[in-house]
């Protein structure tokens, strides 16, 4: 039994000896080269000079260094300790310093959960102020953080479980000689002494420059019960932490002494301290090169700036003449449009039309705009164009795209209008990626565009001819209401006058046959609107060459469906049959009526609006009426004259009365081969397209000037076209333009006049 008790005593004494060897009451680091008792973490390293570097000049770092052995505090008496260390905070040139250095007393050396920057490498947002987090820290902080109640960017504080200091003061020391506190710049890069003393329940903190003795008055003195803060006082670790953020610096510990007895701290020997490294700018030698280099650089910079200035000036250059001053209120600067469209970038590109590219833009006032860039080769007609653009700006109608103004550069015009968020109508008709418009939406668009054209023809101060009515020029606003836009070809003339233009411009399929000989008129707009109505209803383009012959031309195809009493078969299949049949038939018939090749048989836009709103019944006509369902394409390059090979006969009203047509005119044609082509410079195109095979002799019924007069029937065999007669016909039309302009005095449509002249030439040849 005694032997067994002796063994227990021996083992216990060995265990106590082991614990005593692992715990210490004091230590000193005159150099940190002996790393046996050091615990280093994160960016903390020991330099060859013996300096302990906690952080280097890198962003968002933190470093920890602890004495590896726990401190042996008394388990019964009051807790006390003293520590004295020398540190240096060296900022990187041109940067603010890091977040500072902290002396730490903690039951653990593990701070992997901590955050850098303002949390100093020992705290984080979740542990901030937690009573279960047992940490005492003395901070030398060089960043002002109002969230943590910092007083400035150069202070010393006492932290308990939180980065919010329980005691804080600007870095300074008490001078007995001056009897006042002298400030210290923590980021001076010079070594600074720090003393931390705790006895009883009072914690004192002092700082001073390296050459100054410990001040007689501490900088901070605050009561703290460390017995409550550290219930397990037998296992506490002392060390340092440092952190950086976007503010960076090198943070060093040069020397460190610690003891649980205040009087047993080892004295500092300044002569043995390692030198603190300071980053310095490279030494510059004064030489001729150094003197000339700034001069050369200055000249180069001036040259570059001058080049950029002239390039920028040329980039935003505009053309402005004296006559444009009256239009200044409607003119945009190119600079503002360039910035609004982000330099006409691809991201703002909306599309490309026949007259230019369109871009989306945002003005500084928040207004969205569409900018069309139109090229022109000279100044001829520009003044008239600008004047008409400004006049268009005065047009006010809910179904017109508002035109805000213009900008003019060399060989370029820019038209500024309101941006329509839902794009153009043709995208919703032909693009499967776009949502399908219902019939009710399409009818609203048709009615709106009809109202807009009526306004342009009769409601404005001058008659406005749009000259390019088609689905791609119809824009849809946020509510999918139709807005007529793209006035790039519009022309003005006084009410009761004629449009001062003879140029045949427009889009193939929408151009009235008389456009090339008579020029633009309200009737040519009506024709294009008729094609547009059929386009919206049928969901197809006016001419689609890839289809079968009978379906190739929309106008003819719709008329053929009407002849077969199957008009609804021509409707857009994407509607899925969801429409009002009466409305669809009315719109289709009205489209055929408006696209009649006989101009006098077309309604006015005022009548069209009344028809669409059911305020006026449609006139009595059929698919066999003269000019209904006949497609007469117009070739606008005027390089040849084309007439179909056919024979014609003239008769009086007695023949027309037996015809199913209710119009006094009947024009039948054949699907015979097209007439031969003769090349003549600046000649006009007259194209007659046959409808279906028939005998060589066909008939044209003309109105009689006198109901009592008798007209003999003139018949002939098929006569082949002859180049000479075509040339003569062209020469007659060019030499006697009054035939086109005064044809109405003869009571005959101009097409009949042209065909009659041709056949009279043929008969004369025979």
Curated annotation (Swiss-Prot):
Positions glycosylated per UniProt: 56, 124, 128, 181, 204, 225, 232
Disulfide bond sites: none
Superkingdom per UniProt: Eukaryota
Binding site for ATP: 350-358, 372
Listed result of changing residue 525 to N: In dorn1-2; loss of kinase activity. Impaired increase of cytoplasmic calcium concentration in response to extracellular ATP
Intracellular or extracellular location(s): Cell membrane
Knockout or disruption consequences: No visible phenotype under normal growth conditions, but mutant plants (e.g. lecrk-I.9-1 and lecrk-I.9-2) are defective in extracellular ATP-induced calcium response and susceptible to an avirulent isolate of the oomycetes Phytophthora brassicae and Phytophthora capsici. Impaired increase of cytoplasmic calcium concentration in response to extracellular ATP.
Catalysed reaction equations from the record: L-seryl-[protein] + ATP = O-phospho-L-seryl-[protein] + ADP + H(+); L-threonyl-[protein] + ATP = O-phospho-L-threonyl-[protein] + ADP + H(+)
Top-level EC class as recorded in UniProt: transferase
Signal peptide start and end residues: 1-21
Keyword ATP-binding applies: yes
Residue ranges annotated as Extracellular topological domain: 22-289
GO biological process, one term: extracellular ATP signaling
GO cellular component, one term: plasma membrane
Catalytic residues (positions): 468
Family listed: In the C-terminal section; belongs to the protein kinase superfamily. Ser/Thr protein kinase family.
Quaternary structure and interacting proteins, as annotated: Interacts with RGD motif-containing proteins, suspected to disrupt plasma membrane-cell wall adhesions, via its lectin region.
Domain notes: The legume-lectin like region mediates RGD motif recognition.
Protein name, per record: L-type lectin-domain containing receptor kinase I.9
Annotated source species: Arabidopsis thaliana (Mouse-ear cress)
């Amino acid at each position: 039994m005694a032997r067994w008790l002796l063994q227990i005593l021996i083992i216990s004494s060995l265990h106590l000896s082991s614990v005593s060897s692992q715990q210490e009451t004091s230590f000193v680091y005159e150099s940190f080269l002996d790393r046996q008792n050091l615990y280093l973490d994160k960016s903390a390293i020991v330099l060859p000079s013996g300096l302990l570097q906690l952080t280097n000049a890198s962003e968002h770092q933190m470093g920890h260094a602890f004495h590896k052995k726990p401190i042996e505090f008394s388990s019964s008496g009051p807790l006390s300790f003293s520590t004295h260390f020398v540190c240096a905070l060296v900022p990187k040139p041109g940067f603010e310093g890091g977040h500072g250095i902290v002396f730490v007393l903690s039951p653990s050396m593990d701070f992997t959960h901590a955050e850098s920057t303002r949390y100093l490498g020992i705290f984080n947002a979740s542990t901030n102020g937690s009573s279960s987090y047992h940490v005492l820290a003395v901070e030398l902080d060089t960043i002002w953080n109002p969230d943590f109640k910092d007083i400035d960017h150069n202070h010393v504080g006492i932290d308990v479980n939180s980065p919010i200091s329980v005691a804080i003061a600007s870095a300074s020391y008490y001078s007995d000689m001056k009897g006042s506190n002298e400030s210290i710049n923590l980021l001076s890069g010079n070594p600074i002494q720090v003393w931390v003393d705790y006895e009883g329940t009072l914690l004192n903190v002092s700082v001073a420059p390296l050459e100054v003795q410990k001040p007689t008055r501490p900088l901070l003195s605050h009561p703290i019960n460390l017995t409550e803060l550290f219930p397990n006082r037998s296992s506490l670790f002392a060390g340092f932490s440092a952190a950086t953020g976007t503010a960076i610096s090198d943070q060093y510990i040069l020397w460190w002494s610690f003891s649980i007895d205040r009087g047993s701290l080892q004295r500092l020997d300044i002569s043995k301290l390692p030198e603190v490294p300071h980053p310095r700018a490279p030494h510059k030698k004064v030489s001729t090169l150094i003197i000339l280099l700034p001069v050369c650089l200055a000249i180069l910079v001036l040259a570059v700036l001058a080049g950029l200035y002239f390039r920028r000036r040329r980039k935003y250059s505009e053309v402005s003449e004296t006559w444009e001053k009256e239009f200044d209120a409607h003119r945009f600067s190119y600079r503002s449009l360039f910035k609004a469209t982000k330099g006409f970038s691809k991201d703002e590109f909306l599309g490309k039309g026949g007259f230019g590219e369109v871009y989306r833009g945002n003005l500084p006032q928040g207004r969205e705009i569409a900018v069309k860039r139109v090229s022109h080769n000279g100044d001829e007609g520009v003044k008239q164009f600008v004047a008409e653009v400004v006049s268009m700006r005065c047009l006010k109608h809910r179904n017109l795209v508002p035109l805000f103004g213009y900008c003019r550069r060399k060989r370029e015009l820019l038209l500024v209008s309101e941006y329509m968020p839902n794009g153009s109508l043709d995208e919703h008709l032909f693009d499967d990626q776009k949502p399908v418009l219902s019939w009710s939406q399409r009818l609203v668009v048709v009615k709106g565009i009809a109202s807009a054209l009526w306004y342009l023809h009769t409601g404005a101060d001058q008659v406005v001819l749009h000259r390019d009515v088609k689905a791609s020029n119809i824009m849809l606003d946020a509510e999918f209401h139709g807005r007529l836009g793209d006035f790039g070809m519009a022309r003005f003339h006084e009410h009761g006058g004629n449009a001062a233009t003879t140029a045949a411009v427009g889009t193939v399929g929408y151009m009235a046959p008389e456009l090339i000989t008579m020029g633009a008129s309200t009737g040519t707009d009506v024709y294009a609107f008729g094609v547009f109505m059929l386009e919206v209803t049928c969901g197809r383009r006016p001419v689609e060459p890839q289809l079968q012959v009978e379906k190739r031309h929309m106008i003819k195809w719709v008329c053929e469906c009407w002849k077969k009493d199957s008009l609804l078969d021509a409707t857009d299949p994407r509607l899925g049959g969801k429409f009002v049949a009466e409305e669809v038939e009315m719109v289709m018939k009205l489209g055929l009526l408006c696209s009649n090749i006989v101009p006098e048989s077309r309604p006015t836009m005022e009548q069209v609006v009344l028809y669409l709103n059911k305020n006026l019944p449609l006139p009595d006509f059929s698919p066999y009426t003269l000019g209904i369902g006949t497609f007469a394409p117009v070739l606008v390059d005027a390089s040849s004259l084309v007439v179909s090979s056919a024979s014609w006969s003239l008769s009086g009203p007695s023949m027309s009365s037996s015809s199913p047509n209710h119009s006094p005119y009947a024009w039948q044609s054949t699907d015979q081969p097209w007439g031969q082509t003769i090349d003549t410079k600046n000649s006009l195109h007259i194209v007659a397209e046959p409808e279906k095979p028939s005998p060589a002799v066909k008939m044209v019924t003309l109105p009689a000037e006198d109901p009592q007069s008798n007209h003999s029937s003139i018949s002939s065999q098929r006569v082949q076209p002859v180049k000479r007669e075509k040339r003569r016909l062209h020469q007659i039309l060019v030499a006697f333009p009054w035939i086109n302009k005064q044809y109405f005095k003869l009571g005959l449509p101009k097409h009949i006049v042209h065909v009659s002249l041709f056949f009279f030439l043929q008969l004369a040849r025979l």
